[in-house]
Amino acid sequence: MCVYKTYKGKLKITSIPARADRPRLPFPLNFLIHKRKLYLIDTIAEVQRCADCGSYFKQTHTCSTRRRDFYFHHINTQSSDWWEEIKFFPLGAHPDTRRLFVVYDVETYTWHGSFGKQLMPFMLVFTLFGDAQLCEQAVNIAKKQKWSSWPKQANTFYYLNPQRNKVGSLFKQYRDALQEAASTLLWRQFLADNPCLENLCLKLGYVHASDIPFEELCTLELKGQPTFLEVYVVGHNINGFDEIVLAAQVINNKQGIPAAFKVSRNFMPRCGKILFNDLTFALPNPTHAARKDFKDWEEGTPTSADYKFQFVKFMVRDTFALTHTSLRNAAAAYALPVEKGCCPYKAVNEFYMLGTYRTDADSFPQRDYWSSDEEYLLNKSLWLQENSGAYDIVQRTLDYCAMDVLVTAELVKKLQASYLDFVHTSVGLPHCNFNVLQRPTISSNSHAIFRQVVYRSQRPNRSSLGNFLLAPSNEMYDYVRESIRGGRCYPTYIGVLTEAIYVYDICGMYASALTHPFPAGKPLNPFDRALAIKNWQDRLTQLHRPIDYFDRTLLPAIFTIDADPPPEAFLDVIPPFCSRKGGRLCWTNETLRGEVVTCLDAITLHNRGWRVQILNDPRTTVFPQWECLARDYVQLNIAAKERADKEKNQTLRSIAKLLSNALYGSFATKLDNRVTVFSDQMEDKYVRGISDGTYDIKSTAFVETDNLSSSVMAELKITYSPVKQQTDATRKHRQCTPTSNSSSDEDAPFYTLGDPQNHHVTYTYKPITFLEADDSALCLHTLQKKSSLIFNNRYPSHIASFVLAWTRAFVSEWADILYLEDRGTPLEDRILKFVYGDTDSMFLTQRGKELMDTRGKHRLKGNNRPLVFDPTNPQLTWLVECETQCPRCHGDAHSQESVFLAPKLYALKNIYCPSCRAESSGKLRAKGHATSQLSYDLLVTCYYSTEQLGDEKFGTSRLSLRRSLVSRQTHQQPFTVTETTLARTLRPWKDRTLRAIDRHRLAPYSNSHPNPRNKELCWMEMY
């Protein structure tokens, strides 16, 4: 007899042996215990399990596509977490949100501290605008704290103090007071709507209603309409400078906030800048409810019920992250009514360091303090016209700083109004209350607009983009990231070239690529995936039959391949693919093994004569359909750009260009498992993660205490009496003596100072610094998940991979234009046509230009040729234009002589037009170098000196600001900005990623000339 018992999805079998004293039954007796019930089993049969849908069957089985998909995406333990739905929230903000803007700027001088030359603020100016009530409160706080009013503009204040920490300390007090005032305003409104809290707090054992914990408030039945307050601290380039310099003074952000608020902070340092530094003080929203009708969301308009909390938000925003240009250029690009002034920074720095600065005969700062003769003469003439007496450098610096603040304030207003108009008219969301400052960067704004456009077109009727567009996660995230290949940048010629060089550039390469089809929908299950891969392999096996990029019978896919190149005489100096197998990204003609590619790359390789074999990989992904996901988004930007050109609206043109270029970058955002938190603001999930081993503390750093707000007790001297211990008899005698007061002089005899050499002891206490922050507020932890897998529900990273694959298809077609006639001729015997290439540009010789004018004529910009992919007439859509144009006749021009030393290190001597014989200055690029110290002749001299084995050393140096936010290096302190001298050596390319054909020409690695860095072994099975 057997007893079967089910437990947690498993079957446990217990055999009960037959007893000898009882007769045997003629049939087996089997029981099943399931859910506390006993069943008698009639028959038992062996079954099989379907690997595709998880069903059990005896002999034959037919599973549906729907069941296979569900099992693959939701049940299978290996693949169920590979793809996540992308969360969505409407683009706009709540229409009743009240906002206050604090726009500020600081001026600094150099201070030599323990960690090098640090920049210390001595002046801060800010201006206020926004909601009338909030603005009035902010002005009153400024006056109460004795900020000085700038007489030339209302609601503008400043503070001037060269002593260290004074400026930051006062600004900290002001921001703390703003936080307290705004949170108090929200709490009073919340309490007015819920007066029952006053009585409830006493029943719960609290003194004040504000002492009721946030978690307790969430369980109560609350009333009233939510209040949304936002305070923006804004500046230009403050995330890379001002906020770091002042951060030590403003890190204590919970001061004076009642326990009823839920306080959360989003702090993210990246690349030496503060990407996010947002604080939220939240209370429950009584009107919150789950949404059932999503029509409002399609229009980008959230309602009060969509917000789980009502809040006060404090956000730091950098206008540089929204404009990607200097304040002076932004003022011109956005047609602001005010202009940025000029300031002799070095003179100001010397004045505060040395107490003086050098002047000319008119007591005006000398010429070398100004950036150019023009700037020097203009500012001097303006000063002389004012006839305001002696030059007051402090007052001039104050006026300059205040004007910067006013320019930034006007820029903020212009950005808000212009982006709102863009969303209403160009995007077609007239009811959307869009606030560009709600998100910190142009990339995050472009991605939000893209998601809104997709949501409107697809109508998923849920709080995500649905299955139409998913995000790769965990194992699949790493697999997709392997298929993302960077750009191309290398010279195929080293040295001085006396031939004519034309520079051609792809027009809006990423924008054009984004209009092409991309994968959409939920990836196929393994069974259907195998059928699709079989179809791909059958087509790739037909070597002499080109594959159309837009063949709809071939589904979009990402897979692992091996690829073998054609004979070397049929290869080009522009390979179709690149590899990281050697440790560095290298464009190579070598055999490819185990490369993760998109199906577009497989087509590109196949059409260039490569033999492609798809490998069996469980992570292989096939999507059900092609869709032009971003075409509408790019089209509306192009339409806005054309409208701006017609209306001569520079602001609209700048917005459209920025949004168009930023979308690809948002797709390619790389996530990691690290997070930086302050010790006193560590959320519960991180505390639990550290305790259960999910997170590790990778590093801990402390903010430099020299920069902190503090109070100092000066040096203190105390003299102590060296009186010897009294005898017991003396003590007894004094105890018997009547006293009128227990605190008489007998208990503590007055000490009279005697001989300082013999009769006293003096202790000298060093100055004591009392910091205005707890130790936990100074400590930063960098936490990292122990698991290397990355959860992603934000970015469809595979779209970035396909964008780059489309650009490689563009360049491959460009290579066919240049080198189709040379196929079959060894590389060493070919005519020089191409000498340098960036991701979207090529430097061509005269022969290369002739081919572009003949075979590539259809790819030249002009004659209304399209830049946007047309789904009704599918073909690769890209155009190029000659960048070296004559400034006089606007015809194609060339450089008569050029020098190429290394990637991103070259110079064109001049730009000469053969039509009108006009000549203009050339072009010099030297990444990492101070280009003001370089010239064409210097690069030529450097090349010849190196070739002739000369001893002369060439280099450049420049002052650089080293920003440290969170550092694991002992010589770098968190939240400091130090000034360093960056020296770079100037020399020809040493560590090349190409092989040499002769003294000048280079070619990609191939099987006959393999990459010496590639030490990776590949497992191959021979049959």
Swiss-Prot record:
Disulfide bonds: none annotated. InterPro entries: DNA-dir_DNA_pol_B, DNA-dir_DNA_pol_B_adenovir, DNA-dir_DNA_pol_B_CS, DNA-dir_DNA_pol_B_mt/vir, DNA/RNA_pol_sf, DNA_pol_palm_dom_sf, RNaseH-like_sf. It is found in: Host nucleus. Belongs to the DNA polymerase type-B family. One of its GO terms (molecular function) is nucleotide binding. Heterodimer with the terminal protein; this heterodimer binds to bp 9 to 18 of the genome. Forms a complex with viral pTP, DBP and hosts NFIA and POU2F1/OCT1 for initiation of replication. It is an enzyme of class 2 (transferase). GO terms for biological process: DNA-templated DNA replication; viral DNA genome replication. This DNA polymerase requires a protein as a primer. Eukaryotic-type DNA polymerase involved in viral genomic replication. DNA synthesis is protein primed, and acts in a strand displacement replication. Assembles in complex with viral pTP, DBP, host NFIA and host POU2F1/OCT1 on viral origin of replication. The polymerase covalently transfers dCMP onto pTP, thereby initiating complementary strand synthesis. It comes from Bovine adenovirus B serotype 3. Its EC number is 2.7.7.7. One of its GO terms (cellular component) is host cell nucleus. It catalyses: DNA(n) + a 2'-deoxyribonucleoside 5'-triphosphate = DNA(n+1) + diphosphate. Keywords: DNA replication, DNA-binding, DNA-directed DNA polymerase, Host nucleus, Nucleotidyltransferase, Transferase, Viral DNA replication. This is DNA polymerase. Signal peptide: none annotated. It comes from the Viruses. Residues 726-751 are annotated as: Disordered.
